């Protein structure tokens, strides 16, 4: 990568700017430029696309995204200590990198980017799930074409989980309802500085033209939240606040009231959401 952008290795960048990952910000820096380049390639053809990156840190993945031909990268970094390192990346790629010192949860990113838009990020562990839920819950089709995101491996496994598995839950349902998520890369702790206690994984989400099964998004969100908040209870108990005669509602949707949330397929949850919505 240094041969492409003329910038030094990331370990030198971190040393030069006195950077260290902050646990309270969910930071773990990925320093291997071969890996950051691979993640950028796993996002697909970036030429002609604007790319949103959240939590760029010292800019390793940012460099990969620019080298892969992203038309423009918007990098949102909450930690002001990383800004000088990112400014060096911006200088190496004039006019193609905008760095925003802000909290990604508070930024209207769609208004700052031009379609087609792809989101590629090594997400800070403390906000990754919340950001994903927001991006999946927006109107459909969403403002983005695809998501390529790094999570803790345990979170990635929850995203692609199937009914009946221990990892299966609301995150799997929301992800699989309108996208095709796939784990495309697993990384060991030693790939990061400092090494986290767990493995990490990259998930690529291909958006679908529409939902797999019809349902109102708000109702489906409410039903799944109630069901999985008490996942070990029978649905007639966990969903009793959903309707006066919840057992009849469940049976009308083809669901046995004694079933538990982890046993229901996405199709069954959508059928229940339609029945609740009337």
From Swiss-Prot:
Its EC number is 2.1.1.182. It is an enzyme of class 2 (transferase). It catalyses: adenosine(1518)/adenosine(1519) in 16S rRNA + 4 S-adenosyl-L-methionine = N(6)-dimethyladenosine(1518)/N(6)-dimethyladenosine(1519) in 16S rRNA + 4 S-adenosyl-L-homocysteine + 4 H(+). SUPFAM superfamilies: S-adenosyl-L-methionine-dependent methyltransferases. InterPro entries: KsgA/Erm (IPR001737), rRNA_Ade_diMease-like_C (IPR023165), rRNA_Ade_Mease_Trfase_CS (IPR020596), rRNA_Ade_methylase_Trfase_N (IPR020598), rRNA_adenine_dimethylase (IPR011530), SAM-dependent_MTases_sf (IPR029063). S-adenosyl-L-methionine binds at residues 28, 30, 55, 77, 103, 122. It comes from the Bacteria. Keywords: Cytoplasm, Methyltransferase, RNA-binding, rRNA processing, S-adenosyl-L-methionine, Transferase. It is found in: Cytoplasm. One of its GO terms (cellular component) is cytosol. Pfam families: RrnaAD. Specifically dimethylates two adjacent adenosines (A1518 and A1519) in the loop of a conserved hairpin near the 3'-end of 16S rRNA in the 30S particle. May play a critical role in biogenesis of 30S subunits. NCBIfam families: ksgA. This is Ribosomal RNA small subunit methyltransferase A. It comes from Cereibacter sphaeroides (strain ATCC 17025 / ATH 2.4.3) (Rhodobacter sphaeroides).
């Amino acid at each position: 990568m240094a041969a492409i952008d003329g910038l030094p290795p990331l370990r030198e960048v971190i040393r030069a700017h006195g950077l260290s990952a902050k646990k309270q910000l969910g930071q773990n820096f990925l320093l291997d430029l071969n890996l950051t380049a691979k993640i950028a390639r796993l996002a697909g053809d970036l030429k002609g696309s604007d790319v949103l990156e959240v939590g760029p840190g010292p800019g390793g993945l940012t460099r990969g995204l620019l080298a892969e031909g992203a038309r423009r990268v918007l990098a949102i970094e909450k930690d002001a200590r990383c800004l000088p390192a990112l400014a060096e990346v911006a200088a190496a790629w004039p006019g193609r990198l905008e760095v925003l010192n802000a909290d990604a949860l508070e930024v209207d990113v769609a208004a700052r980017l031009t379609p087609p838009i792809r989101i590629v990020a090594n997400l800070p562990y403390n906000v990754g799930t919340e950001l994903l839920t927001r991006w999946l819950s927006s109107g459909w089709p969403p403002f983005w074409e695809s998501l390529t995101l790094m999570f803790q491996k345990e979170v990635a496994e929850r995203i692609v989980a199937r009914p009946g598995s221990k990892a299966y839950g609301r995150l799997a349902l929301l992800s699989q309802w309108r996208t095709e998520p796939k784990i495309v890369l697993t990384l060991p702790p030693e790939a990061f500085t400092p090494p986290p206690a767990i493995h990490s994984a990259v998930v690529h989400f291909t958006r679908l033209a529409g939902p797999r099964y019809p349902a109102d998004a708000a109702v489906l969100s409410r039903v799944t939240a109630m069901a999985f908040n008490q996942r070990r209870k029978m649905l007639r108990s966990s969903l009793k606040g959903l309707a006066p005669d919840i057992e009849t509602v469940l049976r009308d949707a083809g669901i046995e009231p004694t079933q538990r949330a982890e046993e229901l397929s996405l199709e069954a949850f959508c059928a229940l959401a339609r029945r609740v919505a009337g």
